[in-house]
Amino acid sequence: SKHLRSTAFEMALFGTGIIKGPFAVNKEYPDWSEEGEYTPRIKIIPQLNHVSVWNFYPDPDANNMDEAQYVVERHKLSRTQLRGLKRRPFFREKVIEECVAMGESYLKESWEDTLADYDMHHDVNRFEVLEYWGILDRDYLDSEEVDLPKEFEDADQVQANIWLCQDKIIRLVINPFKPVRIPYMAVPYELNPYSFFGVGIAENMEDTQSLMNGFMRMSVDNAVLSGNLIIEVDE
């Protein structure tokens, strides 16, 4: 529910909320036997994740997700989180350790300190990881020695998922969804037919707020004038 709340908040504030998924994930439920032995139950559940619009980069020529050829999501991960990716399917453990050995690589964007309302500082002990979902040419996949299923043998391009860190590929797989889709949903507060991103409450209120500000300034100016010294001349 917190992911849905965060998406609804950004939808109203910025005009667009981004949801990623659903994915099937294994969730561990703690359990103990009568002898006190820890025997957790593993259950496959659907999972949705909120993605901030500040970390979401869609195809710039698309007006909606149906038109998007690709999207890129930007992750900010600690060493522990980066190493945790090794427990997920198809991540390259050796390459991840090489990235960790190279040291943190996160470069702050200009807007991040403003959003966080912190003093500006540029030393961030995190890794920047980019996640790509979209079209890839067949020749590129062959060069990376990706095993393609038989149904893609005659395809010129395929949908793929790539994770990058330190300019190294830490995961490259064929899009597992059937039918094939990019697993992101962009929900506009108010649809803008000529842009991928929608219109939020703040942008809708801009003209009204400017008008209210003008009336407030007029009220203050009138109050100042009415408080001026009044001189009466008796002829």
Question: What function would you assign to each model-found segment?
Answer:
Residues 1-235:
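Extended alpha-helical, oligomerization-prone segments that build pores/tubes and scaffolds
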